[in-house]
Amino acid sequence: MATKLNKKDRLRQLKIEIDKNPFYTDDELAELFSVSVQTIRLDRMELGIPELRERIKNVAEENYHKVKAIVGSEIVGELIDLELGKSGISVFEPTPDMAFLKTKIIRGHYIYSQAESLAISVIDAEAALIGVANIKYKYPVRIGDRLVAKAEVIRKRGNKYFVWVMIKVKNKEVFRGKFILASLESDNTEKEVQ
């Protein structure tokens, strides 16, 4: 915003911005409106808009009931958007205990787990397993990074789902994976996955 808004206009615009993107941090909003973080927090309180973590949690809770293949609590990160059989988005903020002590870089299996659980969540099946995973870690993820994963079902052939997952930190791709998932019939879980 080029010019500073008066309080009434700022409150109105703040509501519009958070409605458009509920994942803005208070720091980002303060920069956007050229005010202090404290001013943004007071404005949010006045409008009854919860803090970022609560907004993410609220959006995620609306989506967990849609998931068929795994239990919502098994999803790594917060599931913020889900269209079964098509696409999904999750947000994950790794904690310091997930990092290597020396480098403060997040261990790869946490990043993979976010991608895997999102890939399983987006397919429209009662039970599924990863049959093939072709993954690439592109950049290190550090403590404090917020990972935004987007999954898309590219194709379905028989009981196989082809899902692409990209994970970004601040619009920079840090991980990508192509997964082939097998939908399992509930009475035949011993069937070969590939």
Curated annotation (Swiss-Prot):
Q: Which InterPro entries match?
A: HotDog_dom_sf, Thioestr_dom, Transcription_factor_FapR, WH-like_DNA-bd_sf
Report the coiled-coil segments: none
- Which GO BP terms apply? fatty acid biosynthetic process; negative regulation of DNA-templated transcription; negative regulation of fatty acid biosynthetic process
Q: Which UniProt keywords apply?
A: DNA-binding, Fatty acid biosynthesis, Fatty acid metabolism, Lipid biosynthesis, Lipid metabolism, Repressor, Transcription, Transcription regulation
Kindly list the GO molecular function terms attached to this UniProt entry.
DNA binding; DNA-binding transcription factor activity
Q: What SUPFAM superfamilies would the database entry show?
A: Thioesterase/thiol ester dehydrase-isomerase
Top-level taxonomic group: Bacteria
Described by its record, this protein's role is as follows: Transcriptional factor involved in regulation of membrane lipid biosynthesis by repressing genes involved in fatty acid and phospholipid metabolism.
User: HAMAP family, from UniProt?
Assistant: Transcrip_fact_FapR
Q: Return the similarity comment.
A: Belongs to the FapR family.
Q: What is this protein called?
A: Transcription factor FapR
Q: Which gene encodes it?
A: fapR
